[in-house]
Amino acid sequence: MNDYRPLTTEEIEVLKHNDCWAEDWTSVNVSEDFKPNFMHRVMLYGEINIGSFNKNVEVSQGFVKHSGINNATLRNVTIGDDCLIENVGNFINNYTIGDDCYISNISTMETTEGATYGEGNLVSVLNEVGEGNVILFSDLNSQLAAFMVKHFPDKEMKEKIRQLIKTDIDNKMPDRGQIGNNVKIINTKEITNCVINDYCEVNGASRLSDCTLLGSVHGNVYIGTGVITENSIIAEGASVINSVKIQDCFVGEACQLANGFTASASVFFANSYMSNGEACAAFCGPFTASHHKSSLLIGGMFSFYNAGSATNFSNHAYKMGPMHWGILERGSKTASGAYLLMPATLGSFSVCFGKLMHHPNTRNLPFAYLIADGDKMFLIPGRNITTVGLYRDIKKWPKRDLRAMENRKSIVNFDWLSPYSVGEILKGKKILENLREVTGDNVSQYLYHEYIIPASSLHKGIKYYDIALRIYMGAVLKRVLKRDPAITPPASHVGVGDWDDLSGLLLPVSEEEGIVRDVKEGTIENIEQLLDRFEEINANYRDYQWAWTYQMICDYYGISDITLEDANRIHEDYIKARRSWIAEIRKDAEKEFAMGDVEEEVFRNFVDSLDQEIEYEN
C-alpha cells in the first residue's frame, strides 16, 4: 500500500477547479506523485486515500482511457495506483480498492456493519431442514465439505471443525470490503459487503451481497449480466452469468453457472456446470452437470454426474418435512424425465430411467441400469460397464479439467476402477451369485429389494463384473511391474479394508477414521493441517491401492503371494477381459449407429479409437 501525504494547497485548488468537493480536505491523503488534474466532479467524505494516475486503462478491446476519478461520491475509501473510477451513480462507502482497477457505471458499493463477506455461513445440504452441515469459507474444498456432511452428526466433531474454521476466518477477515488489483466492475447496480480478489470481473450484475470472489492471476472470476449472489463464495476460475440467482452457496474452481440457473444452500465443486435449472440443498461434487430448465437437483449428493432434462428428486414425504436425501455415487446419470424417491443410494456409475420408487439402495450393485416401467422397477446390474457412454465419460473427464494447476484445491481422482468401485463390484458379484444359488437357475427373474432382475441380466451382470475385476487387477499389476519387476508385496497394510469416496478423493476408511481421531484429539490444530492431510492421503493413493489390490488378487486367484508366473496369468486374463470389454462397447456403438441418425464419420472415428485400445495392453 502507498505511503500517503496530505494534499497541497495547489492540488486542492486544482481539484476545486475540476468541480471536486471534500467534507474536510485535511482528511484527504494522496500518493507522492498524485496528479489532481485527473479527477473531475468527485465528492469526498470521511477518510480518503488516493493513489497515482500514471497509466492508461483499457476499458474495451483497443479502447483506452487515462486513469482517474470522474463523477463519483466516495466515503472512507482507499484507492491504489492507476485506477479508473467513473460514473458512480450513488456512492462508494467503506472500501479499499487495489491497483489498476476499472470501476464504471455502478450504483452503490459499500461495507456495512456486521459484514461477513460470505465467510462462516453455515448451510444445510442434503437435509433441506437440517441444522447445518457445511460451513462456507474461502479454503473450502470438496473433500472437507464431504467430510463435514458425513461427520457433523457427531457433535464433538462438528464443534471442533467449527472452531478450526472460525479461527481461520478470524485471522483473514478484513475490517472492510476489499477490491483487489486488476479488477473490473462495470454496469453493476449494487455491491454490498464483498471481497473481490485480483483479476475478477463483474459486468452487468444486479446485486452482490456478502460475497467473496476468489480470483487470482491463474484463474479469474467472472460475474455477468443480471446475476444476484447473496451470502456466497465463488472460487478461482468460476463464472456466474446470464441472470443466475444464488443464495448461501459455494461455487468451486472452474465451475460454470449460467442462463437463469437458481440455487440455494448448495455447493458446487471443480468443473461443475449448471444451466437453466435449479438446485436446493444439493452437494454437487466434481464434474456435476445439469443443463436443462426443467431439472431440479434437491437433497442429493453427486459427483461426475449428468442430469437429463426434467430430472427430479422427491425429498418430501409430506409428513415430517423436506428432510429426506440421497446419494448418487460418482459417475451416475439420470435420463430425461427421471424421478428418484428419497431416501435412496445408487452405486457408482448407475443410470436411472423413469419414476423410480421403493427407495432403491444399490450401492453394492454398481454400474447398474435402474428402469421404471409403469409400477414395475427393474435392475440391470453391471450393464453400464459395457456402454459407449461410460467409455466416453472416463476418457473425457480428465481432458475437461479447466482448473489451473495452481487452483486445484479440490482433489479429483479420475480412476473409474479403484478399490472403492471395485470393492462394490466384488460385493455385487457375490450378491448376484447368492441370488442365483438361493433361487436357482430355472427362473425368469430375481427380486432384489423390490427391484426385478431379469435372469439374463443377472447372468450378464456376473460376467460384466468379472470382466471389470480382471481389467482392474491387470491394470494395477501392470503399473506395479513397471516400477518393481520383482512384485514386492506391499510394505504396509494401510489400504486393506473398506474404502470411501470423499467427493473426488478415494481413500481407505482407516485413513478417514484417523483424521476424525486426530481432529477430536487436537493433533490437527488448524485448517491448513486438515487440508494437507487430504493431500497427503491422495499422494499415497498408489501405495494404498497396491496394498488393497495385492490382497484382492490373492483372494481372487486363491494364492498367498504373487509370483511372476501368477503375473503372466493375470496379464493374460487382463488382455482377454479388456478385449471382451472393447468388443461389447463396439456392439453398443454399432447398435446406436444402426438407428440411422449417427453420422458415419462420427461412428468410424469412435470405432478407430476402440481399435487403438490394443496399444494399452502391455
Protein language model features and the residues they cover:
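Intrinsically disordered, low-structural-confidence terminal and linker regions
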Residues: 1-9
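Phosphate-/polyanion-interacting regions in eukaryotic proteins
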Residues: 68-80, 84-159, 186, 532, ...
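Glycine-rich hexapeptide-repeat left-handed beta-helix
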Residues: 9-10, 14-24, 30-53, 57-69, ...
